[in-house]
């Protein structure tokens, strides 16, 4: 309209109908349009009011229609939100995560699953062992079946890694593109799936003379507990007729703190035990994974005439 007035196509006294906005306007003597449908004639500054679609201090430009003003006041752009992708790793019929005795042979069977959310398409999904990729695919879920591994005095750590394309840009609530925070192309790594090799505490009793203290003898004791620590308390039940007691744990721990004969409340039984250092094998037995153990043995003069309990504190 302004261009037509300037060109002289339209001048004062004319009445025009605007096709694009469906408004009628009268051209006044000063060649300025007067709209039949109300429009603001001056700019309006928002002053002292908050919570509107436009902020305090902003300006509503002149020439806005009533509909446009209402929209500006009651419609406020809310940016789109984006959810990051994720990837998980789970057991798929192989060795569960957690602790095993050092020397145990495990077969990892794992499943890696990509959760796309607002990222682009998956391009690669991998199973990592430490920093090394041991298997990969292009579709989720990806199943990995590895070779048998002997876990030593260590933690074997697996994880899943997914590489993906850029995600699409969403619109805000007003239908306008809202790119801030959209997901760029990249990769994501799962939390660790750990299998830790740990040593056992061994303990038990027997009939007759105390046998020679060897790795094999220690490993054959009837009871065991994984990963003993300083301060651990455990009970050794001694049945009628038993004549010797043996317990053993890694030599990296302190000397036994206390052995209590529970039935008599005698806390000084540790002095009756003899400590011997023995190299004890890991779960494979034989000479595999030998580690120094403190082996405590106690030989009774006569077989136990009644049930007894030794409460041991490392």
Tell me what each language-model feature is:
Residues 91-108:
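Short, solvent-exposed loop/linker segments at the N-terminal edge
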Residues 74-78, 110-119:
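Acidic, Ser/Thr
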Residues 67-90:
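Proline/serine/threonine-rich low-complexity linkers at boundaries of modular beta-sandwich domains
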Residues 12-38:
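Short, surface-exposed terminal/edge motifs of secreted or surface/virion proteins that either
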């Amino acid at each position: 309209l302004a261009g037509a007035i300037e060109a002289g196509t339209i001048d004062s006294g004319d009445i025009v109908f605007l096709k694009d906005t469906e408004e009628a306007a009268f051209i006044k003597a000063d060649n300025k349009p007067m709209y039949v449908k109300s429009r603001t004639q001056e700019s309006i500054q928002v002053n002292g009011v908050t919570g509107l679609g436009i902020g305090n201090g902003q300006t509503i430009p002149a020439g806005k229609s009533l509909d446009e003003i209402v929209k500006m006041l009651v419609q406020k752009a809310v940016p789109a939100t984006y959810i990051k992708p994720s990837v998980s790793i789970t057991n798929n019929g192989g060795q569960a995560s957690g602790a095993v005795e050092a020397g145990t042979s495990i077969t990892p069977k794992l499943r890696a699953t990509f959760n796309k959310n607002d990222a682009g398409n998956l391009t690669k999904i991998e199973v990592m062992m430490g920093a090394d990729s041991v298997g990969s695919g292009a579709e989720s879920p990806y199943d990995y079946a590895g070779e048998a591994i002997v876990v030593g005095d260590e933690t074997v750590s697996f994880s899943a890694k997914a590489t993906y394309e850029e995600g699409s840009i969403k619109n805000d609530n007003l239908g306008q593109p809202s790119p801030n925070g959209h997901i760029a192309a990249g990769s994501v790594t799962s939390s660790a799936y750990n299998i830790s090799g740990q040593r056992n505490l061994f303990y038990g009793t027997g009939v007759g003379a105390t046998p020679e203290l060897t790795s094999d003898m220690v490993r054959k004791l009837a009871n065991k507990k994984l990963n003993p620590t300083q301060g651990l308390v455990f009970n050794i039940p001694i049945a009628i007729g038993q004549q010797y007691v043996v317990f053993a744990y890694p030599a990296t721990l302190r000397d036994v703190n206390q052995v209590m004969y529970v039935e008599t409340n005698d806390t000084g039984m540790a002095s009756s035990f003899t400590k011997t250092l023995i190299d004890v094998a890991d779960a494979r037995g034989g000479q595999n994974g030998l580690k120094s153990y403190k082996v405590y043995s106690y030989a009774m003069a006569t077989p136990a005439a009644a049930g007894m309990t030794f409460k041991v504190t490392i």
